């Protein structure tokens, strides 16, 4: 079966569709249509508008989705997903990136792109997706001593499989390939210019992807991937490539944040107050760890930043929370005005 090569398992087959329909998997998403692979081949399909009219953007098909397709090449429904990667837009709307993958490969290069704060953000959405995160550090040929990078990674990604690779010499690929399960679906996350396209070519053993050079002055690259697309490799792995994303908003699920910052979460259990904000309360275990140096200040500040961002998106998506926030600020402003009126004049 063609679809078995594309990751079709009993999990999806047990989701029944109409007898006149076919199972398919979305292999690429364009503005007005989708590329779908079925047992009858690959073709471009459109949505049956009436079936998706009232659904939010997060319920529309994404690359990796298994779908129900009609004989008229229309997508009738999206099957239940096993994993999902999405990001929050500036308008606090969820934008779907990919679905039904086994591994989330976070690709960073060992030049100016190496950024622990960004890595923590990627790890948060990777854990949140339900897939297994793997860190891929490209351009390993540029570094003589990898020890400092390894030590930094252990502070934010302890236990996450990490591979230093060189696309030119194929260094590191043998170990990675040995650890990936056969016929797995991999989604690649990372900024532009980190070598994702070259990485795919190295993993595939063929020039599947167009590559571009990066500027030497700031290590920034051009977008060689302009849309989300799936590739079936000869060795059986399925790769979902995504356009470079240097910045993106995290979603509303707390689980990914708790896993990425598990050290902070564990410390918070020892705080004196159960509702401790970990800023200035007495008996705060998090603040005590900051004071004695066992907790990194940068790690803590990034945790706070992502907490605030998640709370912001939650308020934007919940009228009740938004109203509570407005009421809270009204109370603060009222107290401030009362204080200014009653304070002694100089």
Swiss-Prot record:
GTP binds at residues 138-141, 190-198. Monomer. Associates with 30S ribosomal subunit, binds 16S rRNA. Its cofactor is Zn(2+). Keywords: Cytoplasm, GTP-binding, Hydrolase, Metal-binding, Nucleotide-binding, Ribosome biogenesis, RNA-binding, rRNA-binding, Zinc. Belongs to the TRAFAC class YlqF/YawG GTPase family. RsgA subfamily. It comes from Listeria innocua serovar 6a (strain ATCC BAA-680 / CLIP 11262). PROSITE patterns: ENGC_GTPASE, G_CP. This is Small ribosomal subunit biogenesis GTPase RsgA 1. It comes from the Bacteria. GO terms for molecular function: GTP binding; GTPase activity; metal ion binding; rRNA binding. One of several proteins that assist in the late maturation steps of the functional core of the 30S ribosomal subunit. Helps release RbfA from mature subunits. May play a role in the assembly of ribosomal proteins into the subunit. Circularly permuted GTPase that catalyzes slow GTP hydrolysis, GTPase activity is stimulated by the 30S ribosomal subunit. Residues 93-248 form the CP-type G domain. Zn(2+) binds at residues 271, 276, 278, 284. Its EC number is 3.6.1.-. It is found in: Cytoplasm. HAMAP family: GTPase_RsgA. GO terms for biological process: ribosomal small subunit biogenesis. It is an enzyme of class 3 (hydrolase). Binds 1 zinc ion per subunit. NCBIfam families: ribosome small subunit-dependent GTPase A. Its main location: cytoplasm. It holds the Pfam family RsgA_GTPase.
